[in-house]
From Swiss-Prot:
GO biological process: protein ubiquitination
Pfam families: zf-RING_2
Source organism: Arabidopsis thaliana (Mouse-ear cress)
Keywords (A to Z) from UniProt: Metal-binding, Transferase, Ubl conjugation pathway, Zinc, Zinc-finger
Name of this protein: Probable E3 ubiquitin-protein ligase RHB1A
Amino acid sequence: MGGCCSSSRKSHLVGTPVYYYCPESFEELVPSGTRAGVGSAFTTGLLVDIGLETSIPDTFCAPAPLPYDLLLGRPQCTDSESIKGRMSGSSFETLATCEDLGESDCKTLASSVILSPRKSDFSKHQGLKILVDEEEDCCPICFEDYDVENPRLTTKCEHEFHLSCLLEWIERSDRCPICDKEVVFDDRLN
């Protein structure tokens, strides 16, 4: 089987492209009775530019991307014997079901779990709020901390910026970069 390629020489760029016939094997050089003719030679041979460089490129070729459904992490075991071994260590037989407890106990347990948040969950949320406040102690335009040389300025929409960053921003737009309201700020510095 073969193919074709057009010439990329500068002299041929002006006119019609030139095609070169390159057979894949020596047998294609001799026309047989069934393949005689120019049309059949072009369909079975390979056309290549004479000036084509066939050496291996020195550039790095990136590997093929991973399939989207590939799971990263520890491999999943599909052997039924190993699954049975893991299941035998756990005691699913001893778990209480709703039939064992009675239907009213199950409903009471479910409603009490939903209505009463645990104290540990509440403390986790407070810890996250403290971390967010600490992370937001920088200018949202340049992401640098506030200091004496570049002070903090609070706008009427209660967003904080460096004075220099906000003045530069106002040259391009009169809207707040965070909430898109009109930027109005006090003359006093915070």
